[in-house]
Amino acid sequence: SRGLGDVYKRQVLKLGSVHQCNCCLGGKTLHPLVSVIDLSKADLSSHTDFKFGFYTILLGECKCEACRYGHQYYDFSDGTLICLTPGESISMKDSNNTRPSKGWILAFHPDLICGTALGANIRDYTFFSYRPEEALHISLREKQVILELLDKINQELQRCIDCYSQKIISKYIELLLDYCERFYERQFITRNEANKQIIGRFNRLLDHHFHTIQSQSADLPTIEDCAGSLHLSPAYFNDLLEYETGKSFKEYLQFKRFETAKDWLINTDKPLNQIAQELGFRNAQYFSRLFKKMTGCPPNDFRMPN
């Protein structure tokens, strides 16, 4: 589920189709697979918790701090954007019953993008797997870009459906998602100092794992384990890591294993078998082969000059 607080403590309204979403939130069904809904006209008095059976992009313009889903003092405050995959739930209010005063929803069914470039690449937009508290907080200029694209989609919906409708609308949605990707990268920039602190905590987690006795018999930490310890979604954590270090979680974990191995080779007398075991390699031979590939020399040669 997605949302502030426990959404399952309240009744969740399941909306399986775009038409149901329109009926509930006051939109008009101009196309069975896609809709742009003005939340300022929606009646949220009876339901604020929803489970959508389609892709949903929520642009909230609530000025209340509690409604901004993870907003930090270094973030912009002109809008909050959340992206949901089919089957996810979200609460449009917090524990203080604060609702967005206005905003927009772009709802589109997977069938709309089936067979299109967007359909083939939709998984590349990893922010669909972020938590609401990892929402995108946009500037006035960025919000204007999003609103202009929503207006373009709405204009296309006003036309009669023809053989070009799906293609054109899908391209507008793809462009909107590309802008979201750009704006998220900008948000990583504005959160640079906070992100460095997260990387520092991650490094300490790995150091603790590799330097405890338990690690000798334990599996390597997973991205789910580490992201959970840092109170982040795996998708957001991996994207943050790639932005800050240029490495994915898997690549960074491998990097840390070899950095730790170098440290142990120089500063301890641990045998290769023990180093390989404690760092999660299947055996000393496999570790030695990978170490040589990574550093250009075998572990014993790396250790000898020191």
Language model region names:
Residues S1-Y8:
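Short, small-residue-biased leader/transition segments that mark boundaries at the very start
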Residues L33-R131, D162:
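N-terminal regulatory/effector-sensing and dimerization cores
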Residues G79, F237, L241, Y286-F287, ...:
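Short hydrophobic/aromatic patch on the recognition helix
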Residues F127-E174, Y179:
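Amphipathic alpha-helical segments enriched in hydrophobic/aromatic residues interleaved with Lys/Arg
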Residues S170, N192-L230, E251-K270:
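A short, Lys/Arg-enriched amphipathic alpha-helix from helix-turn-helix/homeodomain DNA-binding modules
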Residues Y243-Q285, M304-N306:
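Terminal helix-turn-helix DNA-binding modules in bacterial transcription factors
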Residues R289-N306:
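…primarily DNA-binding HTH/wHTH and HhH modules…
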